[in-house]
UniProtKB/Swiss-Prot annotation:
It catalyses: 1-(5-phospho-beta-D-ribosyl)-ATP + H2O = 1-(5-phospho-beta-D-ribosyl)-5'-AMP + diphosphate + H(+). The gene is hisE. Its EC number is 3.6.1.31. Keywords: Amino-acid biosynthesis, ATP-binding, Cytoplasm, Histidine biosynthesis, Hydrolase, Nucleotide-binding. It comes from Mycolicibacterium gilvum (strain PYR-GCK). It is found in: Cytoplasm. This is Phosphoribosyl-ATP pyrophosphatase. GO terms for biological process: L-histidine biosynthetic process. The keyword DNA-binding does not apply. It comes from the Bacteria.
Length: 93
């Protein structure tokens, strides 16, 4: 994969979300999700996982990539809510 300045890596996204969790900017959807707790975040993960599956079955590769990116986002929000680091997860790969 070639990288451009507008491409975000998994690690860069986690760093960005961690910073939002730490600084709590007004109007942040990430902060609102974290404040809503693990239950609400988990529901979003289930929703996004279903959308990934449906996109894989019925939509374009671009639509599938979009749905996967949303699932990765919500997975990272859940990691932050539970206090997991990337290393916690990478150690299980």
């Amino acid at each position: 994969m070639t990288q451009s300045s507008n491409v975000k890596t998994f690690d860069a996204l986690f760093a960005e979300l961690s910073e939002r969790a730490r600084t709590r900017p007004a109007g942040s959807g990430t902060v609102a999700a974290l404040d809503g707790g693990v239950h609400g975040i988990g529901k979003k993960i289930l929703e996004e996982a279903g959308e990934v599956w449906l996109a894989a079955e019925h939509e374009s590769d671009d639509a599938l990539a979009e749905e996967i990116s949303q699932l990765l986002y919500w997975t990272q929000v859940l990691m932050l809510a539970r206090g997991l680091s990337l290393d916690d997860v990478y150690g299980k790969l």
